[in-house]
Amino acid sequence: MSIIVNQIVLHQLVKTSQDENTVQLKTHLRDELLPITAETEQMMLQLHQEYQNKTKAYGVFQETSNFAQILNRTLENDIDFLAFSHQSAELLRQELGKYSFANDGTLILCQYNFLATDYLFIALLDSRYSMLVDENLEIKQTHYLDITQFDIACRINLTELHLDAKSTRYLTFIKGRVGRKIADFFMDFLGAEEGLNPQVQNQCLLQAVSDYCQQADLTKEQTQAVKKQVFDYCKGQINVGEEIVVTELSANIPTLNEQSFVDFAVSQNYGLEENIPPVRTALKSLTKFSGSGKGITLSFDAELLNSRIFWDEATDSLTITGLPPNLRDQLQRQTKE
């Protein structure tokens, strides 16, 4: 798959001092855009692919967003991309300096097209140090941009923003390992608030599937078969990096009580989006029971309940018949010691 880079620029944020709660940063700005070469396009393709695999949250611009105002001026050709990047770098410097985790970094801003969709990608990349051997077989230190490990990044779907300004999913940002501070920081920088919540959408989808089966008075086995079909479709979408399309999902499961799943979901007002970003951990509950606590972790296929695994609610206990061989072997070895 190819990527078309339209405009790209790099700037640097340099840490000059730090106290207990804040960091002083300065900007080192380019005075012209980067030339578009095979190297820049290859870098952006890799960044795009890495970003696709990150855990992301969704946001929308607030009416008072300074960043959105600058972006709109750029899209309307009131200012050029270089000026936009300079103003964005300054906004980023101001917001990032409020957090103790702030550090040096290379800021990349790129407007590109992938699969007929226009994007604006913004990321703060770290530099890494390594060693190289030159033509004289001498060992020297070098540093390079780390384009595989990054936590501070966002992407705006410019095509979706243009077609539907009320969309709740045109803006995404990484939910970084540093925790909530990363989300707060990017929300402040972008002047954004929470948009689509994939976890909530997945939970609503699961509830809709359960209710759909219940209203048709399906047996336990029939219900589990439908849930397995739902899970298989969703797993397939995850494997190819696509979202759950509710109409496609509906076509992959039986029509119950002469009503398709999509019609049922609409009539019952579950608030499902037409396309839902899949959350793997949430979808697992379609076919598995799992839980952990007090030193115990359990996970088993839902179809085993009341066949090999029995729950006694009164005594709050599970009875398991036919233990996994490796677990049985461990228990036998332990009791013989």
Curated annotation (Swiss-Prot):
Disulfide bonds: none annotated. PANTHER family: NUCLEOID-ASSOCIATED PROTEIN YEJK, PTHR38772. Keywords: Cytoplasm. It is found in: Cytoplasm, Nucleoid. GO terms for cellular component: bacterial nucleoid; cytoplasm. GO terms for molecular function: double-stranded DNA binding; single-stranded RNA binding. Belongs to the YejK family. This is Nucleoid-associated protein HSM_0096. It comes from the Bacteria. The keyword Lipid metabolism does not apply. InterPro entries: Nucleoid_associated_NdpA. The keyword Nucleus does not apply. The lineage of its organism: Bacteria, Pseudomonadati, Pseudomonadota, Gammaproteobacteria, Pasteurellales.
